[in-house]
Amino acid sequence: MDRTLSPATLKTELADNLILDVRRATDRDASTEQLPGANWKDPEKLADWADGLPKDQDIVLYCVRGGSVSNSVVGALQAKGLKARFIEGGIEGWKAAGGEVVAK
């Protein structure tokens, strides 16, 4: 399975995915917005929540810019057999592509 998903592709599939915000707590706290329907999960506590995710649903996650945080979380989730990908460019790439954000 690919590790990334383009913002353009996600726009057509948004409703079909479980959306996870995995920005570090300080980055999330500094922001006023998130993707619609996103649930925040602390990437530092991945071991506490990863096993509770559905194995039969596509999972899309994002951090600030789609870098090391998203990449490491996707790697860990895929290693557990989950269908996880991250948004290329993170929430910043999503917004730059005209993706909708909402107040958190």
Task: Name every feature range the model reports, one short phrase each.
Residues M1-L18, R24-V60, R65-K104:
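Rhodanese-like catalytic fold shared by cysteine-dependent sulfurtransferases
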